[in-house]
């Protein structure tokens, strides 16, 4: 069984965020960190080299594979800010339709910048995801 590369580390979240070159992305990431911290009641931790995660949960797959993973998290990437959210069975299409400019993938929400989305709707998506992860 392959070892999961992305694990919680002791690296400094603040140092990582200070290293985000684009000032507006850095500010957005700090705000997203606050939103996620509020939703999970957890302090941010680095997962691997580039993901800021909140909380921890144990996942078991039908294949028998088990791993520890963050409840929710985010990562500033070259093209966008990736939010790692727990979506349960599916995305909440009603909330997503009110969010603004975004894309979705498997458990990921991609936004360019916070100014492209409705922050209140994003907070609801984050809170819903945190609650979903809590129950898994």
Q: For each of these PLM feature ranges, what is it?
A:
Residues 1-136:
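Charge-dense, helix-prone N-terminal extensions
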């Amino acid at each position: 069984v392959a070892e999961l590369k992305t694990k919680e580390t002791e690296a400094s979240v603040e140092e990582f965020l200070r290293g985000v070159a684009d000032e507006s992305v850095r500010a957005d990431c700090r705000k997203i960190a606050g939103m996620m911290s509020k939703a999970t009641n957890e302090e941010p931790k680095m997962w691997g080299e580039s993901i800021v995660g909140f909380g921890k949960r144990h996942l078991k797959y039908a294949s028998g594979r088990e791993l520890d993973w963050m409840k929710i998290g985010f990562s500033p990437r070259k093209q966008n800010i990736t939010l790692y959210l727990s979506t349960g069975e599916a995305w909440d299409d009603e909330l997503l339709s009110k969010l603004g400019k975004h894309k979705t993938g498997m458990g990921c929400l991609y936004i360019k910048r916070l100014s492209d989305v409705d922050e209140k709707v994003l907070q609801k998506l984050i809170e819903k995801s945190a609650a979903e992860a809590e129950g898994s």
